[in-house]
């Protein structure tokens, strides 16, 4: 609301790509940071390059994707990024970081942990010409009537598998249902930054405690298969569904708090309804976090980068 002591640089002048096909089954493409992301995904699909098709419909530019390791519907850019060219502000030099140096994690990277250290200039992706699409996310698989696998494999006859274009179109359709596309000005739910909170990644012990709390509150069945939604995460940890936690901590889809509120289609999206302020949005976000923390003992962290403000830690 009051601004912040800094400058925002837009990478709109950084455009273009360089294709290197000399990597066996892969094609490596270095894409300038200012290329629009969704258009680039569409280009890859049109060329038959697999690896990014599930990331369709995400707004922004290519240079933003490695910063928080953008992911959706079973894919993350870390799976295909091989290098990132950056301006190292501390050294005053342009350098190239390989994927290991980027230290990618769930919605995380060295760029996010050190936001003042680097300016992303270009990203190199390794894609699979003629490759099959990745269908490992259950919601996407159901929409495609495909059988998901943890590695995205599809055992059906190749002629029966969905194409890259079908996967991209289905992802966009799913995103539209959740108001996660920006092309409908009449949809007030689209005025958000996408998912405001990341899904908390916790130890199995914490996950068990969350489930015990939910059972004690009568939110899930005392026995049986009905449990708090959770998914395997690296290092033996567990990823909990933040949207479920929010909705079971007293916040409903479509709930309004003055000029801001929760999307009526997606509990993780906090929306601006017109005439609001950053302060009002963050007040709502902090109230949601506190309610989840008190009820389930788990803290939620914001997915967007916050400028000129702070966020409470667990």
How should each PLM-predicted stretch be described?
Residues 1-91, 95:
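Anion-binding (especially nucleotide phosphate/pyrophosphate-binding) glycine-rich loop
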Residues 94-279, 295-314:
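Phosphate/pyrophosphate- and phosphate-bearing ligand-binding catalytic cores of soluble enzymes
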């Amino acid at each position: 609301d009051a601004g912040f002591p800094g400058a925002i640089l837009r990478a709109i002048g950084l455009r273009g790509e360089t294709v290197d096909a000399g990597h066996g089954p892969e094609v490596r493409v270095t894409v300038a940071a200012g290329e629009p992301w969704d258009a680039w995904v569409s280009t890859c699909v049109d060329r038959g390059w697999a690896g990014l098709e599930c990331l369709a419909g995400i707004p922004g530019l290519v240079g933003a994707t490695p910063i928080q390791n953008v992911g959706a519907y079973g894919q993350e850019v870390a799976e295909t990024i091989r290098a990132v060219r950056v301006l190292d502000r501390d050294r005053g030099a342009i350098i190239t970081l390989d994927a290991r140096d980027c230290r990618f994690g769930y919605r995380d990277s060295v760029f996010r942990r050190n936001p003042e250290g680097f300016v992303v200039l270009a990203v190199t992706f390794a894609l699979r010409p003629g490759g099959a699409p990745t269908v490992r996310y259950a919601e996407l698989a159901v929409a495609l009537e495909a059988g998901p696998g943890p590695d995205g494999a599809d055992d059906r006859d190749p002629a029966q598998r969905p194409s890259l274009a079908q996967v991209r179109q289905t992802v966009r359709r799913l995103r539209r249902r959740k108001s996660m596309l920006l092309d409908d000005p009449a949809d007030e739910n689209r005025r958000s930054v996408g998912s405001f909170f990341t899904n908390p990644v916790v130890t199995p012990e914490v996950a068990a405690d969350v489930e015990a709390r939910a059972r004690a509150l009568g939110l899930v069945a005392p026995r049986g298969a009905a449990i708090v939604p959770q998914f395997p995460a690296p290092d033996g940890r567990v990823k909990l569904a933040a949207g479920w936690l929010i909705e079971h901590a007293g916040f409903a889809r479509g709930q309004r708090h003055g000029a801001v509120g929760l999307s009526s289609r997606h509990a993780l999206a906090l929306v601006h309804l017109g005439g609001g302020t950053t302060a009002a949005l963050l007040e709502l976000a902090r109230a949601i976090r506190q309610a989840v923390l008190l009820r389930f003992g788990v803290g939620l962290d914001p997915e967007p980068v916050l400028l000129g403000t702070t966020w409470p830690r667990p």
